[in-house]
Amino acid sequence: MIRLLIALFLLLASVAPGFAVNPDEVLADPALEARARAISAQLRCMVCQNQSIDDSNAELAKDLRLLVRERLKNGDSDEAVISYVVSRYGEFVLLNPRLEAKTLVLWGMPAILLVAGIITLVVAARRRGARVPGAPLSDEEKERLDRLLRP
């Protein structure tokens, strides 16, 4: 019985993301619906933040799904729909940000800082090893040091 319940739970959990898009949102044209689903999978839900609007049940995600479908019905291209949503919500709405100079800096900065840190450590280690040992103390300096260190 427990195995049956576990199997049923796993089956229901595996199809749960398919329920995010309500039947009243589905377009009659299968090609447009496929494009709408593909676009919705690329856009982040601003409420859930780690889900696409295709997977989210939030009201904002529903509104965005309807907006995507409406724009597609009006003849917009996929890129035009995505650009429209980005213009209203910013780059953060994209689950996979576009490759631009600022994203290259964001992704490249950790590697640059790592290389700079390694170079700094190597230079510091070489400088430390290159120090010339001091000259030995003279008898007078040893005597003075002994006097200073005695209680």
Swiss-Prot record:
GO CC annotations, alphabetized: plasma membrane
Cell location: Membrane
InterPro entries tied to this protein: C-type_cytochrome_biogenesis, CcmH/CycL/Ccl2/NrfF_N, CcmH/CycL/NrfF/Ccl2_sf
UniProt signal peptide: 1-20
GO MF terms held by the record: metal ion binding
Binding site for heme: 45, 48
Residues that span the membrane, as ranges: 104-124
Pfam short name (any one): CcmH
Keywords: Cytochrome c-type biogenesis, Heme, Iron, Membrane, Metal-binding, Signal, Transmembrane, Transmembrane helix
GO BP: any one term: cytochrome complex assembly
Keyword Transmembrane applies: yes
Keyword Signal listed: yes
Entries under CDD domains matching the protein: CcmH_N
Bilayer topology annotation: Single-pass membrane protein
Family: Belongs to the CcmH/CycL/Ccl2/NrfF family.
Function: Required for the biogenesis of c-type cytochromes. Possible subunit of a heme lyase.
Protein name stated in the entry: Cytochrome c-type biogenesis protein CcmH
Organism: Rhizobium meliloti (strain 1021) (Ensifer meliloti)
Organism lineage: Bacteria, Pseudomonadati, Pseudomonadota, Alphaproteobacteria, Hyphomicrobiales
Gene (UniProt): ccmH
